[in-house]
Amino acid sequence: MSVYAPNRQTIVPRVWVGCLACYNGGELVGTWYDAVDADRVLPEDIHGCPTTHEEMWVMDHECMPVRGELDPATAARWGHVIEAEAPQWREAYLAWLDDQGIDRPEDAPDADTFSEILVGEWPSFSDFAEMIVADLGILDGLPESVSNYFDLNAFARDLAYDYVILDSPHGTVWVYQNV
């Protein structure tokens, strides 16, 4: 089976780690880090000098399938889970996690499991269905007088029940196994 796989810019999950004591005191003190490093950020890293403030908190994030704030250890686990995925499929991975309502890193499939779930990316689901017809040879050997009656749109409509289909932000669709 062929797979349409465009070259995408790599998604790197990032987090804004801030000092919780400063935040509670009305001051925003923090900076952006790669999510995989979130659990290693020290108060001294944020403040630039030794401090009595001990609690760090992730107050904002990018490219992560969670809503709202989270602790640095969870952010780091998400970072590792997402970065384990092939760079060209991270965007599809995040979309699928969101669609499935997965909001804890321990519930997310690992890269090997996701590679079995993700079928690929196509310009449309009809293009995917057309590829299935060709790859399986559904119309091979049929006379043209018979194959002309094959309704690809109806086939694609029925086939869609067997898959999860998500629109990508690039005008294409991601196709996943229905698990």
Each predicted region: which residue ranges?
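A broad, low-specificity signal marking well-ordered, structured residues that form hydrophobic/aromatic
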Residues: 15, 31, 56-57, 164, ...
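Residue-level signal for secondary-structure boundary elements
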Residues: 25, 54, 90, 105, ...
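A broad, structure-centric signal for solvent-exposed, well-ordered loop/edge residues
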Residues: 24, 40-42, 65, 157, ...
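Acidic, proline/glycine-rich low-complexity IDRs
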Residues: 4-9, 19, 129-179
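Short coil/turn linker and secondary-structure boundary residues
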Residues: 37-41, 70, 120-123, 141, ...
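N-terminal ordered "arm"
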Residues: 2-52
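Extracytoplasmic/secretory-pathway segments with low complexity and glycosylation-like composition
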Residues: 93-137, 141, 145, 154, ...
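Structured domain cores in non-transmembrane regions
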Residues: 40-106
